[in-house]
A protein has these predicted regions:
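PLD/PLD-like phosphodiesterase catalytic module centered on the HKD motif
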Residues: 1-226
């Protein structure tokens, strides 16, 4: 087992070294960011597929949401992490965001399937499983989100990081766990189309969804820092 603290060694660097042409990725995490994609763009372009599970409800329709979407600020903020979390947005240019989102959108359509946990009270553990062959695979446990901060590329506020990397055959237990959840249609929902639509909104200039999020971000920026 190898320990990654994102100080002496970084998750992003380890993934760059471990991903091969034809790799298969399985990720369970709270958020997915286009800037994490950009950081690993060369490597992610070589994979065969990515299966991604949002560990808590994301892009899930709720009855009351139809009545007044402004009451669902936490959900909107979580979904907005796809185009960069609040800390990433301060570091990245918004015009550059559209270009990255467009490139990421094409990649997602080719290689990614997104599902989400339906239950607020049953958050899943975060992890990454990387399979290169039948006898070469790695698992990364204790990965909260798929963002540049969790990759160790940008600074992360709060508690220190400690990710455990396991090699084959120990990594197989994580893939088995992921597969059991992935195939659970009762508790997961496929949101691939919703995510693709969100990407398209993000890179279309002056789209209503993009303006809506930026407005919310500016209004609640100080509140989110507390």
């Amino acid at each position: 087992m190898k320990l990654i603290d994102n100080v002496n060694n970084r998750l992003g660097d380890d993934l760059k070294e471990s991903i091969r042409k034809g790799s298969k990725l399985s990720i369970a995490a709270s958020t997915f960011s286009i800037y994490a994609f950009e950081a690993l763009k060369k490597e992610l372009g070589k994979i065969d597929e990515l299966r991604f599970i949002f560990s808590s409800p994301t892009f899930v329709e709720e009855e009351l949401q139809k009545q007044s979407r402004q009451f669902y600020i936490p959900n909107i903020v979580r979904e907005s992490e796809i185009c960069g979390g609040e800390f990433e947005l301060r570091l990245m240019n918004q015009l550059n965001q559209r270009a990255i989102a467009k490139e990421c959108s094409r990649w997602v359509k080719e290689k990614v399937t997104f599902k989400t946990n339906k239950h607020n009270n049953q958050m899943l553990n975060g992890m990454i499983h990387l399979k290169n062959s039948e006898e070469e695979a790695f698992a990364y446990a204790n990965v909260h989100s798929f963002t540049t901060s969790d990759l160790g590329i940008t600074h992360k506020k709060g508690f220190p990081t400690l990710i455990q990397k396991s090699n084959f055959p120990d990594s197989s237990a994580y893939l088995d766990w992921f597969n059991q959840i992935w195939n659970n249609e009762e508790d997961l929902k496929d949101v691939t189309k919703r995510v693709q639509d969100y990407f398209e909104s993000a890179y279309k200039e002056n789209s209503p969804e993009f303006i809506y999020f930026i407005t919310l971000y500016n209004i609640f920026n100080d509140f989110l820092d507390d």
